[in-house]
Amino acid sequence: MGYISLALVALLVFFASPVVLADDITPIPADRAQIPQWFMANVKPFSQRRGTLDPELEAAEASRRVIIVNQNGGGDFKTINAAIKSIPLANKNRVIIKLAPGIYHEKVTVDVGRPYVTLLGKPGAETNLTYAGTAAKYGTVESATLIVWATNFLAANLNIINTSPMPKPGTQGQALAMRINGDKAAFYNCRFYGFQDTLCDDRGNHFFKNCYIEGTYDFIFGRGASLYLTTQLHAVGDGLRVIAAHNRQSTTEQNGYSFVHCKVTGVGTGIYLGRAWMSHPKVVYSYTEMSSVVNPSGWQENRVRAHDKTVFYGEYMCTGPGSHKAKRVAHTQDIDNKEASQFLTLGYIKGSKWLLPPPAY
């Protein structure tokens, strides 16, 4: 009996302690109005998360450094690149780069040796990072205005823009706003502008909240394991337009895109929710409002018929005229509560060990 009592006590202590990963299992509410409360309860600031985060991240957050960038002077640096280069390789501290409002015409890379970087714009102000890189000049994934290789990156209140003009049909028109290749990255209130291949959500666990992503074809693509929450997906241009091209290539890969409480908008009609760029894409839309711009078939027909059996295209409790399923392609999955649950918690991106809210400006 003594052994059993100790076991019960241990369990009670575990479930009562702050180490419990409640933020990984509490589902995102179906009511959009409840999301702010849910977020505050499940993504608490560092001061309330000590002892629950990755040890390296805890050490970094405990020793923060702030850099001011103002292109008009009065800060530590006038360019974002200069601020990033001032961070030593093998950095172990959270470095918050506060950006004064303005237009920063730079092609920025956050190297793998510089983790724990935050790019922080001022809420309510216009802070634009712009560049006109193209695939013809740099190659597709290297054309991005912002490239992040480092882990534990965070950005908030930024507009990240590829200013290259809309490509003509049949040209090498890829021009990225961002490529995110680092694990454990979060984006809050960021806007991404481009046309073809706007956002390369490449590899790692990523979180997007209150963002806006605009493009034409495959404007979110890559191999990431990412949760998009309350984010607007806006298609522009005409002709063939596709939102998501996920690059999953086998059932063993633990990745995919989960869009929750998002809005699909755009101009014209016939926009596809996704396509099978590779053999095993995983893309799920939950509680998402789909306007009439969405193609009635939902998803682009697979060019390789064998992929009909390997794609995972899920829709769960979506709304709006574009969510009607009567004409969806046969391999669309109208998933049930149990199946949807895995895409509706922060556990999908293992958030309990690393996800933090944005810092104050």
From Swiss-Prot:
Family to which this protein belongs: Belongs to the pectinesterase family.
Enzyme Commission number(s) of this protein: 3.1.1.11
Enzyme active site: D197 (proton donor), D218 (nucleophile)
InterPro entries membership: Pectin_lyas_fold (IPR012334), Pectin_lyase_fold/virulence (IPR011050), Pectinesterase_cat (IPR000070)
UniProtKB keywords: Aspartyl esterase, Cell wall, Cell wall biogenesis/degradation, Glycoprotein, Hydrolase, Secreted, Signal
GO annotations of cellular component type: extracellular region
Catalytic activity: [(1->4)-alpha-D-galacturonosyl methyl ester](n) + n H2O = [(1->4)-alpha-D-galacturonosyl](n) + n methanol + n H(+)
Name this polypeptide is given: Probable pectinesterase 49
Organism: Arabidopsis thaliana
Record's signal peptide: 1-22
Tissue specificity comment: Expressed in flower buds.
Site (Transition state stabilizer): Q196
Residues reported in the UniProt entry to bind substrate: Q174, R275, W277
Listed Pfam families: Pectinesterase
Glycosylation sites: N128
